[in-house]
Amino acid sequence: MKTTAEIRQAFLDFFHSKGHQIVDSSSLVPENDPTLLFTNAGMNQFKDVFLGLDTRSYTRATTAQRCVRAGGKHNDLENVGYTARHHTFFEMLGNFSFGDYFKQDAIKFAWEFLTSPEWLGLPEEKLYVTVYETDDEAYGIWHKGVGVPENHIIRIGDNKGAPYASDNFWAMGDTGPCGPCTEIFYDHGEHVWGGLPGSEEEDGDRYIEVWNIVFMQFNRLADGTMEKLPKPSVDTGMGLERISAVIQHVNSNYDIDIFQKLIAKVAELTGEKDLTNKSLRVIADHIRSCAYLIVDGVIPSNEGRGYVLRRIIRRAVRHGHLLGAKDTFFYKLVPVLIDVMATAGKDVKAKQANVEKLLRLEEEQFARTLERGLALLDEALINVKDGVLSGEVAFKLYDTYGFPLDLTADVCRERNIRIDEEGFEREMEVQRLRAQAASRFGVDYNNVIRVEGTTTFEGYTEAETQAKVTALFYEGKSVESISAGQSAVVILDDTPFYAESGGQIGDRGCLIATNMRFDVKDTQKYGQVFGHIGTLIQGTLNVGQTINAVVDTEHRIKTSLNHSATHLLHAALRQVLGSHVAQKGSLVSDTILRFDFAQPEAISQEQLFEIECLVNQHIRANHLVVTEVMPIDEAKAKGAMALFGEKYGDVVRVVKMGEFSIELCGGIHVKRTGEIGLFKIVSGSAIAAGVRRVEAVTGEGAINWLQQQQVLLMQSADLLKSDANSLVEKIQQLQDKAKKTEKELQALKEKSAMKAGSDIAKSAVEINGVSVIVQQLENMDVKSLRVIVDDLKNQLGSAVIAFVTKNEDKVNLVVGVTTDLTSKVKAGELVNLMAQQVGGKGGGRPDMAMAGGSQPENISKALTVCNEWLHKNL
């Protein structure tokens, strides 16, 4: 019986024997694709090839692609652990044809791999296939070409309420490439409930889809018209976990070898004896998605991809808590994961220390609030009415205890309770955007500028070339000519202009000819062509016209200083902070460089100085900057770093600066590092959880920045009547004096507040034996209010005190309750009730709570509501 690792390798070997290029799995973070939250199919990395926007050196490819479906449109998270086949992470085996073979070979390849004794050797009588209802060609190939009996071939029509809306018709989106597909199903046998595809019992587990073969033969336009593609292509996908379950003779994916080893380790770490416990499945699944997301540069955070990762980690930790885990355990699964993933685990192995560290830190952080949050949820669930948990409670768990909604839903599901999601959404307000980042992703591929041919880039050696205009786009539409004053995108056959890529902004300059000038403000890539974006200043410009393309060299030189300095900065960061530093984004312009990178801990000022000194050391070393073109595998073997969000071909350009820095890069650089002159870090900050940003200037920009700082220093010294060398000492003296004065003032305020408290005590009213004071006080800060409340609680014995004060346009509220009453009156609930009247919110302990608001005109309403509530509840 084959292991999962052996099945993965057999698939790749089979298609390699059929002339396919084996292509590595792409990152789970899609490269240059804003339409996807995560890579969720094997074809994602080839999408631009299918769209005609990119080319490869091969026309046949095969992959074992890592995929994540959690968050956004494709979200399996809530079902993971409760079904036999839902996962957050899975591997998609695929073979692809880019205008090479089509239906005949695609079908025969699939059948041979599945049924040949040399490969998987599945019994033919166990296999069924579906085809699109009108796809007679595929039907004929299956029946006549392969020999599948007609009672094992099922036609599936439009079963989703619209033309071409079918389980057997695939589309990339509302527009773009699409076509019929054929699916292969495996029959697990009569002992398993379920019916054939298309039947009422098709959702059962007897007949399981193992392979989907898509025939991309149409391009759907916005009006629904189907155009035939000039080069039909093939995209296939077979879930590795599903086919492993078939080969290993089990009905559930969680019973295959890789999951059984992970489940056994989870059971060992948590002490769980029942190996069928669903929580074991959840954790075994989640370690795979979490580890590989971190490997591909995702950091737990409160937005976008990072928030999805945080949700998955916290769901796993909560299920560990259910199993009885008493200590951090999740990160301890990483070594087992590396082992069970075999060759596919090498990427995790390379970053094992960082993966384990981030998982441990996230688990420790969540553990601080998990038990308190679960206690609150348990209390709320006991009091649930009509089987619905209020959205307000769900939001409090999210906002205060870090419980993602799906984690709360997980707990509720176990007790057959649903969540008032509408109420939760109302409470979320602006914060709802955190978990919904995927909803912003989308594009209409027919609006992409698409031009046949390519632009030859001459910019590495030239700043001016003669070129021909091959296309013009005005207001998004292709035109034959433009006139003075019109802004447009100009496509050339050759160009010295660098198009924005790798964080480096596009070149500026001009296109000139007799009586014609087009000012280029930016340069962008559109597939294989370069677009020169700008405005025609003089004359007319026509398609086919020959022009001179002239780069603004001053702008380019300044940009190149910053780009080369960015490489030195990246190397310095890794040397000072550690090899876990990975680029998360960058901007290289003519005025500044910005570098975002993964770093779980804060960077000290001393570390920033060390990084800055290291960069300047290598600038002074005046290293020769060497560029070479080589196969990507050779570049990686030499240690060249590939950068976040960049797409690389089979042959890459490597930029090396001495022995200090080596990166894959297509940008413009200096010839020697000494040309940079000077490097100065101007800021270092955190921009998200686990992501830091460094901004810096170079050359003349660095000198200007230092001169500006010198001016500020001298002006500050003049204002404080000090010299620059004594400025820190002078500021310290002023701070000490201010603190002393502030302390004296606060003491006077507290003394005054205690006197006021004695006077206020006389105004207390009694409600059923409880002293009650509800008042608005003038000219009081929050500290003074708390002093008065504490003093009154001591004076009055059994009491409830509620104060409101106005400071300019803000409202402050303080509520105090003596401890004997906190079972009946909770300060936090009462202060929130009052705060709602003045447009605010707050919280605190049962005996003392504070809140703020922004509607002072409603103070009287807050006081009235408080009085009414106390009369009703005391």
Curated annotation (Swiss-Prot):
One of its GO terms (molecular function) is ATP binding. It catalyses: tRNA(Ala) + L-alanine + ATP = L-alanyl-tRNA(Ala) + AMP + diphosphate. It comes from the Bacteria. GO terms for cellular component: cytosol. Keywords: Aminoacyl-tRNA synthetase, ATP-binding, Cytoplasm, Ligase, Metal-binding, Nucleotide-binding, Protein biosynthesis, RNA-binding, tRNA-binding, Zinc. GO terms for biological process: alanyl-tRNA aminoacylation; negative regulation of DNA-templated transcription. Its cofactor is Zn(2+). Zn(2+) binds at H563, H567, C665, H669. SMART domains: tRNA_SAD. CDD domains: AlaRS_core. Signal peptide: none annotated. Its EC number is 6.1.1.7. InterPro entries: aa-tRNA-synth_II/BPL/LPL (IPR045864), Ala-tRNA-lgiase_IIc (IPR002318), Ala-tRNA-ligase_IIc_anticod-bd (IPR018162), Ala-tRNA-synth_IIc_core (IPR018165), Ala-tRNA-synth_IIc_N (IPR018164), Ala-tRNA_ligase (IPR050058), Ala_tRNA_ligase_euk/bac (IPR023033), DHHA1_dom (IPR003156). It is found in: Cytoplasm. Binds 1 zinc ion per subunit. NCBIfam families: alaS. Consists of three domains; the N-terminal catalytic domain, the editing domain and the C-terminal C-Ala domain. The editing domain removes incorrectly charged amino acids, while the C-Ala domain, along with tRNA(Ala), serves as a bridge to cooperatively bring together the editing and aminoacylation centers thus stimulating deacylation of misacylated tRNAs. Belongs to the class-II aminoacyl-tRNA synthetase family. Catalyzes the attachment of alanine to tRNA(Ala) in a two-step reaction: alanine is first activated by ATP to form Ala-AMP and then transferred to the acceptor end of tRNA(Ala). Also edits incorrectly charged Ser-tRNA(Ala) and Gly-tRNA(Ala) via its editing domain. This is Alanine--tRNA ligase. It comes from Histophilus somni (strain 2336). The lineage of its organism: Bacteria, Pseudomonadati, Pseudomonadota, Gammaproteobacteria, Pasteurellales. The gene is alaS.
